[in-house]
Regions:
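Short, solvent-exposed loop/turn segments at secondary-structure junctions
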Residues: 40-43, 87, 119-122, 178-183, ...
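Membrane-interface soluble catalytic domains
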Residues: 22-25, 121, 235-241, 283-396
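Short, solvent-exposed loop/turn segments at the edges of secondary structure
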Residues: 76, 274-276, 338
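A short beta-strand-to-alpha-helix junction
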Residues: 93-100, 213-226, 269-275, 286-302, ...
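Active-site-proximal alpha/beta segments of enzymes that process anionic O-linked groups
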Residues: 1-202, 320
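Histidine-centered active-site microenvironments of extracellular/periplasmic hydrolases
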Residues: 238-285
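Generic structural signal for small/hydrophobic residues in well-ordered secondary structure
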Residues: 39, 81, 106, 176, ...
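A long, amphipathic alpha-helix that forms part
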Residues: 155-163, 199-246
Length: 396
C-alpha cells in the first residue's frame, strides 16, 4: 500500500517541522484540552431526537456544520486532525516515529496526559505516530465486550482522570476514542429509540440492501448511546467549572454510509456520508456560533495552538488554518484514503487513486454525481493547480 502512494506523491525525506518551532515561553494562563473523537460519527446525527444532550451542548459552542474529516477511515481521520497534513504523509510519519507538533508543544509546556481508547492504539498505529512520544502508562486501552460497554467503562475512567486533575495547577490533555457507533452498532435496551431495527445482524446471511433501513436504525440507537456517554462528560465539565479553563474538541474520525450512494460503511468512497463529520469546539471566552463555511480536520493543530496563545505560523507545520482567524477560508479541501487524495472544491470532487500499478482519476459533483470535468463551468482548475504545487510541501 505504501508503494501505491509513490506513483502520485513524493515520499521519503520527511521535513515535517523544525524543533526550533517549539515555543518554550509559558502562556500566562494555560488551558486544559479535552479531545473527544467518536467512531463512524455522521454529521447529521446531532438532532434533538437522536443526540439531545450533544445537540444542546453544540448549540452553546462553536458548531461547524459543514465540516469534513481528513479521511474516510479511522487512520487518516485521526492522523489529519492531529498533524494537519494530508494522508499521504502517514507512511513517512510512521516510518520516522514522528509525534505531531501539537503533542510535542504540550509536552514542552509540561502538560499532564491521558489517552483512552475503546479500540486499540496499535491498529491503526497511533502508538507509533500521534502518541509516540508519550510514556506507555499514559495510554489506556479497554476493548472487551461490545463498543457501548467499552465506552461506558472508559467514560468513567476519563471522568475520574478529569476529577483528579481539576484542582491541580498543571494543565492536562485528555483524549478519548468512542466505539459505540462502530458496526455492528450494538447498544443496550435503554437506548432503543428506533424499534424497527434488525436484531439478527449477520454479515454472511443478511440481505444488505433489503435490510439497510433496519441496519441504520441499529446505528441510530448506538449513536443515542454515544450521546448518553458524552452527556456524562458534559456534566462533569459544568459541575467542576472546567468550561472556564478547558478547550473541548468534539468530532468524528469519519462518517458512515447506508447505501445513499450504493455503499455501506466507510473507507470505500468519498461520498458526503463517509467524509462529513461533526465538529464542535469550545474555547473559553468565545461566544457561541453556528458556522456554515467549509472546515477540515487539517485545521485543528493551527486552531488549537493559536487558542493556547502560542501563535505559530500554520504554514510552517501544516496545511491547515486557524478556524477562528478573520480571514479563514478554504478554496479547496483534501480528504485521503489508503490509495490517494481527493480534492474538494465547493462544486466538485476530484479523486486521485492508485491501486496496484493502475493510476485512476475520476470526478463527481459535491453531492457525488458523476461528471465530466471538461463540461464543468466552475473554476476548479485554480484549486487543483494549487493543490498539485502544495501537496509535497513537507518533503525535502
Amino acid at each position: 500500500l505504501e508503494d501505491e502512494f509513490s506513483y502520485s506523491t513524493k515520499t521519503g525525506n520527511l521535513n515535517y517541522f523544525d524543533p526550533g518551532l517549539l515555543v518554550t515561553k509559558n502562556p500566562e494562563h494555560k488551558l486544559n484540552i479535552l479531545w473527544l473523537v467518536a467512531e463512524s460519527w455522521r454529521a447529521d446525527m446531532i438532532t434533538p431526537e437522536i443526540m439531545p444532550n450533544t445537540f444542546a451542548f453544540a448549540n452553546e459552542q462553536q458548531w461547524f456544520e459543514n465540516h469534513y474529516s481528513g479521511g474516510n477511515g479511522t487512520r487518516m481521520g485521526l492522523f489529519t486532525q492531529f498533524y494537519g497534513l494530508y494522508g499521504h504523509y502517514w507512511f513517512d510519519v510512521l516510518r520516522n516515529r514522528r509525534a505531531p507538533l501539537l503533542i510535542e508543544q504540550l509536552r514542552a509546556q509540561d502538560y499532564q496526559f491521558k489517552a483512552i481508547t475503546s479500540s486499540a492504539f496499535t491498529y491503526p498505529e497511533f502508538d507509533k505516530t500521534i502518541f509516540s512520544s508519550l510514556e506507555p502508562e499514559y495510554l489506556q486501552e479497554f476493548n472487551e465486550g461490545h463498543g457501548w460497554e467499552r465506552d461506558q467503562k472508559n467514560t468513567g475512567d476519563l471522568i475520574s482522570f478529569i476529577e483528579d486533575k481539576e484542582r491541580e495547577e498543571q494543565p492536562f490533555f485528555a483524549f478519548m476514542f468512542f466505539e459505540s457507533a462502530h458496526a455492528n452498532y450494538y447498544f443496550p435496551d435503554e437506548d432503543i429509540i428506533e424499534s424497527h431495527y434488525i436484531e439478527d445482524f449477520n454479515y454472511l446471511t443478511v440481505d444488505i440492501e433489503e435490510s439497510m433501513p433496519q441496519i441504520k436504525s441499529r446505528y441510530t440507537n448506538a449513536t443515542h448511546h454515544l450521546d448518553r456517554q458524552l452527556a456524562r462528560v458534559y456534566k462533569v465539565l459544568e459541575e467542576k467549572n472546567l468550561m472556564d479553563n478547558t478547550i473541548v474538541v468534539l468530532t468524528g474520525d469519519h462518517g458512515e454510509e447506508f447505501m445513499e450512494n450504493g455503499r455501506w460503511g466507510h473507507n470505500s468512497t468519498f461520498s458526503q456520508q463517509q467524509i462529513r463529520v461533526p465538529m464542535i469546539v469550545h474555547i473559553p471566552g468565545m461566544e457561541k456560533k453556528k458556522r456554515t463555511d467549509s472546515s477540515s480536520h487539517i485545521d485543528m493543530p493551527a486552531t488549537i495552538l493559536n487558542a493556547l496563545g502560542l501563535n505559530m505560523q500554520a504554514g510552517q507545520h501544516s496545511f491547515g488554518q486557524d478556524m477562528f482567524a478573520p480571514d479563514y477560508k478554504h478554496d479547496y479541501l483534501v480528504v485521503s484514503d489508503w490509495h490517494g487524495n481527493t480534492v474538494i472544491t465547493p462544486e466538485v470532487k476530484i479523486i486521485f487513486s492508485v491501486k496496484g500499478a493502475a493510476y485512476q482519476a475520476s470526478s463527481t459533483t459535491i453531492d457525488d454525481q458523476p461528471i465530466n470535468l471538461g463540461d464543468e463551468k466552475s473554476d476548479y482548475q485554480t484549486a487543483l493547480s494549487e493543490y498539485l504545487l502544495e501537496q509535497n510541501r513537507f518533503f525535502n
